[in-house]
C-alpha cells in the first residue's frame, strides 16, 4: 500500500475545480463514486488507452478490459504497476483497496481479488475519472 506516498502533480482545490467538470471533481478529488451503469466507457469496445482525467497519465489498455457485470469499467491489469497507488479504504463499513493515480492522487476506484486470469484482479474504475485515447 502507498499510504505515505506524495503525488508528483499537486494543485489547489480551486485549480482542480477550474480544470474539471463538477462530476469529475466530485469523483476524483472528493473520492466519489458514479452510479453503476451510468459512467462513460462502460460499453466502449474501441482499442486504445484509458488515461487519468486529471493529469493524462496512462492507466489501462483496452486489451485488459473485461465485462465484470458490476456496472463500472473493469480491467485486470494497469499499463504499468507504477501508474496506480493503492490505499486502504475503510469507508462505508467495509475494508477495500482504493486505487489512485500515482501522479496526481486522483481517486480512480477500487481493486478486488475476483478478476479473471492472468492476474485474478478486477480494477473497478469510475469512467468519469478517465479519458480515452484511441489507437
Swiss-Prot record:
Residues 13-135 form the MsrB domain. Keywords: Metal-binding, Oxidoreductase, Zinc. GO terms for biological process: protein repair; response to oxidative stress. It comes from the Bacteria. Its cofactor is Zn(2+). Its EC number is 1.8.4.12. Zn(2+) binds at residues 52, 55, 101, 104. Binds 1 zinc ion per subunit. The zinc ion is important for the structural integrity of the protein. InterPro entries: Met_Sox_Rdtase_MsrB (IPR028427), Met_Sox_Rdtase_MsrB_dom (IPR002579), Mss4-like_sf (IPR011057). It is an enzyme of class 1 (oxidoreductase). It catalyses: L-methionyl-[protein] + [thioredoxin]-disulfide + H2O = L-methionyl-(R)-S-oxide-[protein] + [thioredoxin]-dithiol. The active site is at residue 124. The keyword Nucleotide-binding does not apply. It holds the Pfam family SelR. One of its GO terms (molecular function) is zinc ion binding. One of its GO terms (cellular component) is cytoplasm. NCBIfam families: peptide-methionine (R)-S-oxide reductase MsrB. Belongs to the MsrB Met sulfoxide reductase family. This is Peptide methionine sulfoxide reductase MsrB 1. It comes from Rhizobium meliloti (strain 1021) (Ensifer meliloti).
Amino acid at each position: 500500500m502507498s499510504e505515505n506516498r506524495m503525488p508528483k502533480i499537486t494543485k489547489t482545490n480551486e485549480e482542480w475545480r477550474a480544470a474539471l467538470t463538477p462530476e469529475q471533481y466530485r469523483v476524483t478529488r472528493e473520492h466519489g463514486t458514479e452510479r453503476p451503469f451510468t459512467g462513460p466507457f462502460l460499453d466502449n469496445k474501441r482499442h486504445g488507452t484509458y488515461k487519468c482525467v486529471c493529469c493524462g497519465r496512462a492507466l489501462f489498455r483496452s486489451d485488459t478490459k473485461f465485462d465484470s457485470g458490476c456496472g463500472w469499467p473493469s480491467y485486470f491489469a494497469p499499463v504499468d504497476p507504477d501508474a496506480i497507488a493503492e490505499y486502504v479504504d475503510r469507508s462505508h463499513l467495509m475494508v477495500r483497496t482504493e486505487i489512485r493515480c500515482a501522479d496526481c492522487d486522483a481517486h480512480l476506484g477500487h481493486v478486488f481479488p475476483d478478476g479473471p486470469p492472468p492476474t485474478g484482479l478486477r480494477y473497478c474504475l469510475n469512467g468519469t475519472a478517465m479519458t480515452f485515447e484511441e489507437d
